[in-house]
């Protein structure tokens, strides 16, 4: 078992690393109509033009925090896949309990 710990799942011998695309500016994928729909769901009638970039910034920070915590839970459990429960626990840690996804 060559010292790989529990499971012994050695993923090959390393080999050449595949090139991973650098993801940047994906926050623009949160479109103006999508932000408008979220605001409508929250009961907003009129929306200032400056709101869209501000919303993208706030959403990015929020998601970075949740994902960082979820990945921490995943790494602690020595897994490589982030589960729904990791996200639920990350949200609970930040005081935003989410029901309906197990646990």
Curated annotation (Swiss-Prot):
Q: Which CDD domains match?
A: HFD_H4
The PTM N6-acetyllysine maps to: 17
For this UniProt entry, what is the primary localization, expressed as one broad class? nucleus
Give the residue ranges for region: Disordered: 1-20
Q: Which GO terms describe its molecular function?
A: DNA binding; protein heterodimerization activity; structural constituent of chromatin
Q: Where is the composition biased (Gly residues)?
A: 1-14
One Pfam family hit: CENP-T_C
Its subcellular locations are: Nucleus; Chromosome
| Record's keyword terms, sorted | Acetylation, Chromosome, DNA-binding, Methylation, Nucleosome core, Nucleus
Q: At which residues is the DNA-binding region annotated? A: 17-21
Q: Does the keyword Coiled coil apply?
A: no
The keyword Nucleotidyltransferase belongs to this UniProt entry's keyword annotation: no
At what positions is N6-methylated lysine found? 80
Q: Name one GO cellular component term.
A: nucleosome
Q: Where are the transmembrane segments?
A: none
User: Which sequence positions carry the modification called N-acetylserine?
Assistant: 2
Among InterPro entries, the record links this protein to: CENP-T/H4_C (IPR035425), Histone-fold (IPR009072), Histone_H4 (IPR001951), Histone_H4_CS (IPR019809)
What does the similarity note say?
A: Belongs to the histone H4 family.
Q: What does this protein do?
A: Core component of nucleosome. Nucleosomes wrap and compact DNA into chromatin, limiting DNA accessibility to the cellular machineries which require DNA as a template. Histones thereby play a central role in transcription regulation, DNA repair, DNA replication and chromosomal stability. DNA accessibility is regulated via a complex set of post-translational modifications of histones, also called histone code, and nucleosome remodeling.
Q: How does it assemble?
A: The nucleosome is a histone octamer containing two molecules each of H2A, H2B, H3 and H4 assembled in one H3-H4 heterotetramer and two H2A-H2B heterodimers. The octamer wraps approximately 147 bp of DNA.
| Protein name per its UniProtKB record | Histone H4
Question: Which organism is this protein's natural source?
Answer: Olisthodiscus luteus (Marine phytoflagellate)
Classification from the root reads: Eukaryota, Sar, Stramenopiles, Ochrophyta, Olisthodiscophyceae
């Amino acid at each position: 078992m060559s010292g790989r710990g529990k499971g012994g799942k050695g993923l090959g011998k390393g080999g050449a690393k595949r090139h991973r695309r650098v993801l940047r500016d994906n926050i623009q994928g949160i479109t103006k109509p999508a932000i408008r729909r979220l605001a409508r769901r929250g009961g907003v009638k009129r929306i200032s033009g400056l709101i869209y970039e501000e919303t993208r910034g706030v959403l990015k920070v929020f998601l970075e925090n949740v994902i960082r915590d979820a990945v921490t839970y995943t790494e602690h459990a020595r897994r490589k896949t982030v589960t729904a429960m990791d996200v639920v626990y990350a949200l609970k840690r930040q005081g935003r309990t989410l029901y309906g996804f197990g646990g």
